[in-house]
Amino acid sequence: RRQRQMCIRDRYYDLGLVHRNETNDQVTVDSAEATKKYGVAVKCATITPNAARVKEYDLKEMYKSPNGTIRAILDGTVFRAPIIVKGVEPYVKTWKKPITIARHAYGDVYKASEMKIPAAGKAELVYTDEQGNESRELIHNFKGAGIIQGMHNLNDSIENFARSCFNFALETKQDLWFATKDTISKKYDHTFKDIFQDIYDKDYADKFKEAGIEYF
């Protein structure tokens, strides 16, 4: 019986700092789009430049993390799973099952806007809708110099994150634990919690019960 196979020609994208600088970081975007097209990629370690690297490599700008750029385009989830090898004993002997960490790959600090505050003044969050109406939220009344950072996320992306976590748990037969600082971040982090719970109740509660795993 002949097996059908699909072959993909190797495509190489140089994400070294020199080439990223030559392409104004377009090569990073191109590599992410290729990953979306072909559904698979292997990425080597890259450098996210700081001020010292900008000077060392004579960069045009302080480019953002290539990992962050790629993950944002893929709207993916980062799963950090242990590699279990016979003969390599776990540091905590009582841990008998693997622990996998899932992290949302879109938005947050990777897509944040930042500003240095030079002197006393007021910092606000401002949202302007398509009709020009504004909503304002005070961040802080500065008495002197400081810093601020603005982060965002998208409900659609959070929903995709939730489904990828639930599906991964079902595929690997692992309990899923949700963790966030919703007691402090009552809107930002709590939105994650609410979306996860809503999707679980509607689409995954019965599947988890059938698989013998739990969502906490």
Regions found by a protein language model. Name each.
Residues 37-40, 72-79, 104-106, 110, ...:
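Generic secondary-structure signature for well-ordered alpha-helical cores
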Residues 152-201:
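Active-site pocket-lining segments that scaffold enzyme catalytic pockets across diverse folds
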Residues 3-8:
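Short, small-residue-biased leader/transition segments that mark boundaries at the very start
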Residues 12-19, 192-216:
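Active-site rim loops that border cofactor/substrate pockets in soluble metabolic enzymes
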Residues 33-36, 90-95, 140, 169-170, ...:
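Solvent-exposed alpha-helices and their adjacent loops that cap or buttress functional pockets
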Residues 102-172:
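Internal alpha/beta core interface subdomains
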Residues 20-130, 134:
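N-terminal glycine-rich phosphate/adenylate-binding segment common to multiple enzyme folds
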Residues 1, 43-45, 102, 148-152, ...:
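Short glycine-rich or small-residue beta-strand-to-loop segments that form or flank ligand, phosphate
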